[in-house]
């Protein structure tokens, strides 16, 4: 392996800008900002969305009405000779 060609892999704190929660992980990303986490200083990376604030992980996700969209489509194009599977 060649020496000094790999990026520096080190502990980094990821900060959720929405909730303020901090996550300690390892990364090659660089930052000039630092923060204290569990008594030690780490580089900090600010994130807009993390698992702490993303709707999928928080359970607050919005579901679309797929059935309503299909019914609307069928009503709109009913006169063009297409048949529903229910009519068979």
Curated annotation (Swiss-Prot):
Xref: Pfam families: Ribosomal_L31
Record keywords: Ribonucleoprotein, Ribosomal protein
Single annotated GO MF: structural constituent of ribosome
InterPro entries: Ribosomal_bL28/bL31-like_sf, Ribosomal_bL31, Ribosomal_bL31_B, Ribosomal_bL31_sf
Gene Ontology CC entries for this record: ribonucleoprotein complex; ribosome
Single GO BP term: translation
Keyword Ribonucleoprotein recorded: yes
UniProt key word Ribosomal protein: yes
Record text on subunit structure and interactions: Part of the 50S ribosomal subunit.
Family note: Belongs to the bacterial ribosomal protein bL31 family. Type B subfamily.
NCBIfam families membership: L31, PRK01678.1
HAMAP family (alphabetical): Ribosomal_bL31_2
PANTHER family recorded: 50S RIBOSOMAL PROTEIN L31, CHLOROPLASTIC, LARGE RIBOSOMAL SUBUNIT PROTEIN BL31C
Name assigned to this protein: Large ribosomal subunit protein bL31B
Species name: Leuconostoc citreum (strain KM20)
